[in-house]
């Protein structure tokens, strides 16, 4: 049983799902036009109609399939969803006299959605249409200065609507509203990592059977490492995890992965392909070309190794729920594409996919990793790009430059951990620039590389702020780097947000 969120195009739809799961309720996102049969497959205890950019009067405006609003479950409409509920029930929706974007104070509020909430209520508004005439059976339960109909409810039909976003952090008490909706739906809040680990293991066993062999391409990141542990528990030696060392890893990463996974029962095969990757990258400076070469070489190395290992019926992938959401078009699951941890696979490779994490978010995978015993230094590690240090080494990639960058990166990341700053950053990295400049070391002139340090904070990686690291810490890092990595004589810190910059430099 679940809460089904019908997505009508809001940028915040994913947050609704996350908030419900944080409250202990399983929830799924389906296209706003999903069929009644598809929705009923989820056995919903409640439905949320998301916001979106459309107007209910637009030609071709998205709307739920026939019969959805007749289901005998509570329904919550958010922004466009509220307008649609009101419109379909016979109310009026018109272009607002004054648009509301950003924070607004509710001048009054009440009703079941607001039960237990007291004091000031700040809401995040984003709408150009408003409900101007209530449908029969509804009552207004919240207002702002400029929006007299900010929240509505019909307790007889259990239909509720809000003209703001309770799911965003800018609505501080929105979480309590969503919790109240779960109570209205009668949801048992038992969605947690402990509850689902056994289900995931049993699901893999049911799919693979008693004899099926499973192949996993492992990157060393939290998703594939956690998946390796889960599969090892599910099928034991019938799992083979292939870890390709392309020579573009962080310092000591190969050894860390082997030390973390092998003692926990993962049948791990490590492939040393450094020479092949660096050989193909020689003379290449364009970042997109570097990515393509690395993806191609991953395929080749993976094919060479798997040919030695015998036949596999199943290929496991660490696909997460955001991948599924982003890949689903209006037709729903039929348009979902595969996401390959190994950089892509040939079209003619015939595997059955095993994707236990396809309904999970990253934070849920991290919690499963904790339960399965994955060491914290891997479980809580910052994101690392598939092409590795190749896209943090600007210009041509050589073994010498990778060695320099590995040492700089290790000093920076180790320093963040030492000073207690690592967990406060969402991602931190070092970049080796092709810029060389004059410096003085001792009494001698130097002409060496410039290293750039970057750290950001973000909730979703769609936008990011540069991390305000202490000056004393940055000074310490600069001093350590130029003294321990003699090929570097200048260190800079990137203070650009996203946008306009991306988090990675290439």
Curated annotation (Swiss-Prot):
SUPFAM superfamilies: Adenine nucleotide alpha hydrolases-like, Class I glutamine amidotransferase-like, GMP synthetase C-terminal dimerisation domain. Pathway: Purine metabolism; GMP biosynthesis; GMP from XMP (L-Gln route): step 1/1. One of its GO terms (molecular function) is ATP binding. Residues 191-381 form the GMPS ATP-PPase domain. It comes from the Bacteria. ATP binds at residues 219-225. InterPro entries: Class_I_gatase-like, GATASE, GMP_synth_C, GMP_synth_GATase, GMP_synthase, GMPS_ATP_PPase_dom, NAD/GMP_synthase, Rossmann-like_a/b/a_fold. Keywords: ATP-binding, Glutamine amidotransferase, GMP biosynthesis, Ligase, Nucleotide-binding, Purine biosynthesis. One of its GO terms (cellular component) is cytosol. Gene3D superfamilies: 3.30.300.10, 3.40.50.880, HUPs. Residues 2-190 form the Glutamine amidotransferase type-1 domain. It catalyses: XMP + L-glutamine + ATP + H2O = GMP + L-glutamate + AMP + diphosphate + 2 H(+). It is an enzyme of class 6 (ligase). Pfam families: GATase, GMP_synt_C, NAD_synthase. GO terms for biological process: GMP biosynthetic process. Its EC number is 6.3.5.2. The active site is at 79 (nucleophile), 165, 167. Catalyzes the synthesis of GMP from XMP. Homodimer. This is GMP synthase [glutamine-hydrolyzing]. It comes from Deinococcus radiodurans (strain ATCC 13939 / DSM 20539 / JCM 16871 / CCUG 27074 / LMG 4051 / NBRC 15346 / NCIMB 9279 / VKM B-1422 / R1). The gene is guaA.
């Amino acid at each position: 049983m679940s809460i089904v969120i019908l997505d009508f195009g809001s940028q915040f739809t994913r947050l609704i799902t996350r908030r419900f799961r944080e409250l202990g309720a399983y929830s799924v996102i389906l296209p706003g036009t999903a069929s009644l049969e598809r929705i009923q497959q989820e056995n919903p205890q409640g439905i949320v109609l998301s916001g979106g950019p459309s107007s209910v009067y637009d030609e071709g405006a998205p709307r739920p399939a026939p019969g959805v609003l007749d289901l005998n479950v509570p329904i919550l409409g958010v922004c466009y969803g509220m307008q649609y509920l009101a419109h379909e029930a016979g109310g009026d929706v018109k272009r607002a006299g004054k648009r509301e974007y950003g924070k607004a104070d509710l001048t009054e509020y009440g009703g079941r959605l607001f039960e237990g909430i007291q004091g000031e209520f700040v809401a995040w508004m984003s709408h150009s249409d408003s409900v101007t005439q209530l449908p029969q059976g509804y009552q207004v339960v919240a207002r702002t200065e400029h929006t007299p109909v900010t929240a509505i409810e019909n307790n007889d039909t259990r239909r509720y609507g809000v003209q703001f976003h309770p799911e965003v952090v800018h609505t501080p008490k929105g979480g309590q509203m969503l919790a109240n909706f779960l109570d209205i739906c009668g949801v048992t809040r038992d969605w947690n990592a402990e509850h689902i680990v056994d289900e995931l293991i049993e699901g893999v066993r049911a799919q693979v059977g008693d004899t099926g062999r499973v192949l996993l391409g492992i990157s060393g990141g939290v998703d594939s490492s956690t998946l390796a542990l889960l599969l090892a528990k599910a099928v034991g030696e019938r799992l083979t995890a292939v870890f390709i060392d392309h020579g573009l890893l962080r310092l000591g990463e190969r050894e860390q992965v082997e030390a973390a996974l092998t003692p926990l029962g993962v049948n791990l095969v490590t492939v040393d392909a450094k020479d092949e990757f660096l050989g193909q990258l020689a003379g290449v400076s364009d970042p997109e070309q570097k990515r393509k070469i690395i993806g191609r070489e991953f395929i080749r190395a993976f094919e060479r190794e798997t040919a030695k290992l015998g036949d596999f019926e199943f290929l496991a992938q660490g696909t997460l729920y955001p991948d599924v959401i982003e890949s689903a078009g209006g037709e729903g699951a039929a348009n979902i594409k595969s996401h390959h941890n190994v950089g892509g696979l040939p079209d003619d490779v015939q595997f059955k996919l095993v994707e236990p994490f396809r309904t999970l978010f990253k934070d849920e995978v991290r919690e499963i990793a904790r339960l399965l015993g994955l060491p914290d230094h891997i479980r809580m590690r910052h994101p690392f790009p598939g092409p590795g240090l190749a896209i943090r080494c600007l210009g041509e990639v050589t073994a010498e430059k990778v060695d320099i960058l590995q040492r700089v990166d290790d000093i920076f990341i180790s320093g963040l951990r030492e000073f207690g700053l690592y967990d406060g950053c969402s991602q931190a990295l070092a970049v080796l620039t092709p810029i060389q400049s004059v410096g003085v070391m001792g009494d001698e002139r130097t002409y060496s590389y410039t290293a750039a340090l970057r750290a950001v904070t973000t909730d979703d990686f769609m936008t990011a702020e540069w991390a305000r690291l202490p000056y004393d810490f940055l000074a310490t890092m600069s001093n350590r780097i130029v003294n321990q990595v003699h090929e570097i004589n200048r260190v800079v810190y990137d203070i650009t947000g996203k946008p306009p910059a991306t988090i990675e430099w290439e």
